[in-house]
C-alpha cells in the first residue's frame, strides 16, 4: 500500500472522534510528567487525535507552544490543531523529519512503531532530533502477551480484521525485539512500565492497583501495551555502530 493510500485509510479512521485516552497513555503520564521541565520541548510522532498532548496542556504540565507533533492523517492533524492552535502540529513523514538536530527533550512514539513499514530509518530520524540525554517513550502491542497473540492469529486465519482493527501495516513485535531495534538506533533502554495484563475481555476489570502490583513484580514485559523508556546518550558518548 502506498503512503497516500495509508493516509487515506487513517483519514477515514479519524473521522470518528475517539473519546477515551488509551491505557498506554494513562500508564505513561506519571513518568512523563516527572521528566518534564519548564524548558522541555516535546514531539509526538503519530499523534492521532492528540489525547496525551491535550491532557498535558489542560493540566498545565507543559506550555502549548512547546508541543510539536506529526501524523500522516490530515484529518487527525486538523482535529488537534483546532484544539491546540499554539502547538506545532503538522502532517509529516517520520522518515524525513523537518526539525533541527537535537531539538527535542522528549519524543513519544506510542502505538506507532508496529505500523511502520521500515522502523529502522524512522528511529534514526527520531534519534537525530532528540537532544543529548533526551528521552524516547515508546509503546506497542507486545505479543509476549499470549491472549492477544491468539486473537491476532485467529483474526488473520479466519479473515476477521475487525476483531483487532487491522491497519494497513500491522506488525507483530515482542519486548526484546523492540528494545534491540531501538538500541540499534542509538538509544539506551532504561525501564518498562506495564499496561493491560489480562485478556481483552477483562480489561475493564484491571484496576490501577492491580496494574501497580503486577508492575512491582517486574512483569511489565508480559503486559500487552508496555511503555518503554529510552534515553539518548549525552555529549561525548559513542555513536551507534552501523548495522
Q: Which functions belong to the PLM regions below?
A:
Residues 3-24, 51, 72, 117-125, ...:
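S-adenosyl-L-methionine-dependent methyltransferase catalytic module, highlighting the catalytic core
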Residues 235-243:
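A short, highly charged, low-complexity intrinsically disordered segment
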Residues 78, 130, 183, 242-243:
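N-terminal non-cleavable signal-anchor helices
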Residues 106-117:
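A short SAM/SAH-binding and catalytic strip from SAM-dependent methyltransferases
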Residues 38, 101-102, 118, 132:
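Active-site acidic short loop of glycosyltransferases
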Residues 1-100, 106, 123, 194-197, ...:
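Conserved N-terminal segment of class I S-adenosyl-L-methionine
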Amino acid at each position: 500500500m502506498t503512503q497516500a493510500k495509508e493516509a487515506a485509510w487513517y483519514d477515514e479512521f479519524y473521522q470518528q472522534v475517539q473519546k477515551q485516552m488509551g491505557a498506554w497513555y494513562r500508564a505513561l503520564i506519571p513518568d512523563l510528567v516527572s521528566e518534564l521541565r519548564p524548558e522541555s520541548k516535546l514531539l509526538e510522532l503519530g499523534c492521532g487525535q492528540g489525547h496525551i498532548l491535550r491532557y498535558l496542556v489542560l493540566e498545565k504540565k507543559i506550555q502549548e507552544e512547546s508541543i510539536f507533533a506529526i501524523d500522516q492523517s490530515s484529518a487527525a492533524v486538523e482535529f488537534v490543531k483546532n484544539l491546540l492552535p499554539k502547538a506545532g502540529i503538522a502532517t509529516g513523514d517520520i522518515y524525513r523529519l523537518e526539525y533541527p538536530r537535537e531539538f527535542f527533550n522528549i519524543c513519544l512514539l506510542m502505538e506507532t512503531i508496529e505500523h511502520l513499514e521500515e522502523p529502522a530509518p524512522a528511529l534514526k530520524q527520531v534519534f537525530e532530533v532528540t537532544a543529548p540525554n533526551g528521552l524516547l517513550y515508546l509503546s506497542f502491542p507486545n505479543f509476549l502477551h499470549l491472549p492477544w497473540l491468539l486473537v491476532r492469529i485467529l483474526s488473520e486465519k479466519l479473515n476477521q480484521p475487525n476483531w483487532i482493527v487491522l491497519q494497513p501495516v500491522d506488525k507483530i513485535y515482542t519486548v526484546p525485539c523492540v528494545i534491540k531495534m531501538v538500541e540499534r538506533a542509538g538509544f539506551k533502554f532504561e525501564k518498562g512500565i506495564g499496561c493491560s495484563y489480562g485478556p481483552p475481555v477483562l480489561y475493564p476489570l484491571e484496576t490501577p492497583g492491580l496494574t501497580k502490583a503486577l508492575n512491582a513484580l517486574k512483569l511489565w514485559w508480559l503486559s500487552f501495551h508496555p511503555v518503554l523508556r529510552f534515553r539518548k546518550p549525552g555529549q561525548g558518548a559513542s555513536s551507534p555502530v552501523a548495522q
